[in-house]
């Protein structure tokens, strides 16, 4: 139908499995099990369709949860192009222990970097639990943290799909300008990153006509500010799992706007002292202030206080801490140097 990337959602709850299921599966709840065989089946199917339509179609899946390195390896083996890999998402939204997650994200990102897989981070999720206007600076701060952790893992900036979202209340006066400010600011701060831009979900009501308009405004911001990966919004968001016809309408919406407004970003400049520049400076300054606070307090303390997404987590709580052990004096993982040495 025209999409460049197909993201296959995982079955509900797989993040919390401390093992990877084996083989092809025929059922799932809200998604499909991430197994190596399923990855192979998906990749083979997309390659066949790609031959028919004359272009390569990228495949995206998820290596978040309690098996980040294991699923990253499976994705590398089976030719996945994009994988969800966030340093903080599992802590905040799946209650996975913060020590476990930060260890796992490091090695899994080394694998992603070595395999040429683009990672996507999940800052958009903060705006489903916190207000998109008030919490905008926490999204930027998290993007910067995710970027630095990815660099430590040897991941090139071009493989960083740092996340943010179009999630402000549509009733907000000049909300489009504030969304535009956020997107342009993010693009300028991360000029090489393949930014991941998420569509409106929080304020989708089931009114498919208004929803299609909200998605159109989102697509306008995306092409205007040259976002890297545009996750398409569905007109039936908040009603049911999208039909193929809904996906077709979403692709048609995006292709129309992306073509019709292709070079708008090259033609427009932002007014000094105007709403957009003023908003971007405000968000940036608040993010800097937050990061300075984190420098003195530490990341774990910030997570315990609920600074990100208004979600509080304990450093010794959550799932998976029993899988974390201190490195012995003779510990060695040869793959870390081998994989990072390639870059």
Where do the PLM segments sit?
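Catalytic alpha/beta active-site cores
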Residues: 1-166, 171
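Flexible, glycine/charged-enriched surface loops at secondary-structure junctions
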Residues: 5, 154-159, 192-196, 263-278
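Hydrophobic alpha-helical scaffolding
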Residues: 32, 61, 135, 169-176, ...
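Surface-exposed amphipathic alpha-helices with a cationic face
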Residues: 39-53, 179, 183-190, 258-261
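Short, electropositive alpha-helical surface patch
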Residues: 68-82, 142-145, 176-183, 219, ...
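C-terminal helical cap(s) of enzyme catalytic domains, especially alpha/beta-barrels
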Residues: 95-105, 235-262
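Hydrophobic alpha-helical bundle architecture
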Residues: 182-246, 264-271
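Long, compositionally biased intrinsically disordered regions
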Residues: 253-343
């Amino acid at each position: 139908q025209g999409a460049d990337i197909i993201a296959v959602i995982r079955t509900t709850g797989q993040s919390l499995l401390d093992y990877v299921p084996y083989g092809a599966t025929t059922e799932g709840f809200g998604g499909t099990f991430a197994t190596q065989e399923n990855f192979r089946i998906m990749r083979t199917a997309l390659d066949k369709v790609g031959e028919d339509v004359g272009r390569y179609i990228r495949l995206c899946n998820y290596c978040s949860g309690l098996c980040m390195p294991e699923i990253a390896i499976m994705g590398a083996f089976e030719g996945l192009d994009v994988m969800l890999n966030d340093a903080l998402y599992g802590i905040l939204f799946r209650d996975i222990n913060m020590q476990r997650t930060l260890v796992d994200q490091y090695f899994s990102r080394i694998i992603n970097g070595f395999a040429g897989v683009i990672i996507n981070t999940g800052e958009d999720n903060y705006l489903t639990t916190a207000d998109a206007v008030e919490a905008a600076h926490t999204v930027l701060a998290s993007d910067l943290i995710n970027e630095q952790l990815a660099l430590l893992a040897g991941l090139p900036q071009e493989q960083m799909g740092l996340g943010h979202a179009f999630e402000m209340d549509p009733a907000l006066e000049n909300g489009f300008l504030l969304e535009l400010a956020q997107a342009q600011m993010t693009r300028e701060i991360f000029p090489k990153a393949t930014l991941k831009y998420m569509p409106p979900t929080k304020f989708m009501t089931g009114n498919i006509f208004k929803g299609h308009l909200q998605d159109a405004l989102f697509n306008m911001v995306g092409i205007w500010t040259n976002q890297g990966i545009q996750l398409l919004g569905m007109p039936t968001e908040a009603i049911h799992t999208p039909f193929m016809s809904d996906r077709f309408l979403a692709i048609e919406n995006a292709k129309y706007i992306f073509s019709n407004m292709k070079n708008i970003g090259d033609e427009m400049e932002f007014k000094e002292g105007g709403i957009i520049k003023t908003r971007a400076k405000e968000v940036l300054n608040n993010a800097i202030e937050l990061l300075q606070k984190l420098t003195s307090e530490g990341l774990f303390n910030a997570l315990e206080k609920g600074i990100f997404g208004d979600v509080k987590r304990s450093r010794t709580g959550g799932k998976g801490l029993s899988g974390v052990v201190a490195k012995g004096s003779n510990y060695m993982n040869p793959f870390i140097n081998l994989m990072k040495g390639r870059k």
